[in-house]
UniProtKB/Swiss-Prot annotation:
This is RNA polymerase sigma factor CnrH. SUPFAM superfamilies: Sigma2 domain of RNA polymerase sigma factors (SSF88946), Sigma3 and sigma4 domains of RNA polymerase sigma factors (SSF88659). Induction: By nickel and cobalt. Residues 156-175 bind DNA. InterPro entries: RNA_pol_sigma-70-like, RNA_pol_sigma-70_dom, RNA_pol_sigma70_ECF_CS, RNA_pol_sigma70_r2, RNA_pol_sigma70_r4_t2, RNA_pol_sigma_r2, RNA_pol_sigma_r3/r4-like, WH-like_DNA-bd_sf. CDD domains: Sigma70_r4. It comes from Cupriavidus metallidurans (strain ATCC 43123 / DSM 2839 / NBRC 102507 / CH34). Belongs to the sigma-70 factor family. ECF subfamily. The gene is cnrH. A motif (Polymerase core binding) lies at residues 49-62. GO terms for biological process: DNA-templated transcription initiation. The keyword Transcription applies.
């Protein structure tokens, strides 16, 4: 039996609630999924989480799996989406909290634990609320480029295609939007 057929059988068994069959799918594809995550640049500290999130999502979506298509491709599509989610989350944190690189976010608190303390969580929520309300004060064009690139995670060419602009126009709007946002946030801080 070829691997694709074995995957189809295991997926069908798992979809009917057979956890052992799903465990075999995890064993068959977990290492390759982790290697893919590393190749996409996912930090080692997040690889296991991405793999676990992928398999949890796959377990919940087994009824949607089309047995006429390869299970591995379906699973890796879910994994790729989880990796993109992680990048989006980190990009938003980086943009909103101004870390020079994503590693600075974990080191900024000066503690070994990655989990922020209660004071840091409250401060982060307050800062996020402040930035979100300030985004609403930007003109539509500025808000669109910031949301598409910094929050949704689109590249400048993707944002340009969505907005019907040239890449240079998007670059210019991003620069102006960041300057406006920074000025609004500074003015808000002085109040």
């Amino acid at each position: 039996m070829n691997p694709e057929d074995a995957d189809r059988i295991l997926a069908a068994q798992a979809a009917s609630g057979n956890q052992r069959a799903f465990g075999q799918l995890v064993a068959r594809h977990g290492v390759a999924l982790a290697q893919a995550a590393r190749s996409f640049g996912i930090p080692e500290t997040d690889v296991d989480d991405v793999v676990q999130d992928t398999f949890v999502a796959a377990w919940h979506a087994l009824d949607d799996f089309d047995p006429d298509r390869p299970f591995r491709a379906w699973l890796f599509r879910i994994g790729l989406n989880k990796m993109r989610d992680l990048y989006r989350f980190r990009r938003v944190r980086q943009f909103l909290f101004g870390a020079e690189n994503l590693g600075d976010l974990e080191l900024a608190g000066g503690v070994a634990n990655d989990e922020p303390g209660p004071e840091q969580q409250v401060a982060a929520r307050l800062e996020l609320a402040r930035v979100a309300s300030t985004l609403g004060k930007l003109d539509t064009g500025s808000r669109e480029v910031i949301v598409l690139t910094a929050i949704v995670g689109m590249s400048q060419p993707e944002a340009a295609a969505v907005l019907g602009l040239s890449v240079k126009a998007v670059e210019g709007r991003i620069g102006r939007a960041r300057a406006k946002l920074s000025a609004l946030l500074d003015a808000d801080s002085e109040k």
